[in-house]
Amino acid sequence: FGPFEAVLLHLIQILKPHTEIIWIDNGYNTHATYKFADKLCEQLKLNLKVYTPTMTARRRDARMGGIPEVDTELHLQFTKQVKIEPFKKALKEIQPEVWLTAIRRVQTVQRAGTDIVSADKNGLLKVAPVLNMTDADMIAYLETNNLPNELDYYDPTKVYANRECGLHNRD
């Protein structure tokens, strides 16, 4: 439920209402993100399935001393705990045929070279319908369709805007 996520969620609801929407609630979302998620779920009537890490954020913070520095082994463990493991659990339970993702070329160097349709490392078909959209395109879509946006978003697995979150390069 980060910036511009409403675009993909709206497209999904138009094309295939009642699609199961996976949200990995890592426990580090801002208050605004939770309010945005509630508002968008109500507005779009989303069939939301929430997956969380096994360990709470508070307990993990106590063990790891807070969110670990990026590019360290501890941060890799952190990412696996808060994002990869809940995502794997979601895939195992839901067993989707397709993973629709809101990644866009303008977001990171890795995403700039991504194909709209690909298979991930585990063979799951991954489709990025908004891959070629710019920020201006996304804003125009939000405005045209009277959709909210969430800019007070923080992803502790990325930390910096130009890093990957772990899902698109998971084991």
Where are these regions (language model features)?
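Nucleotide-activated chemistry modules centered on ATP-dependent adenylation/adenylyltransferase
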Residues: 1-171
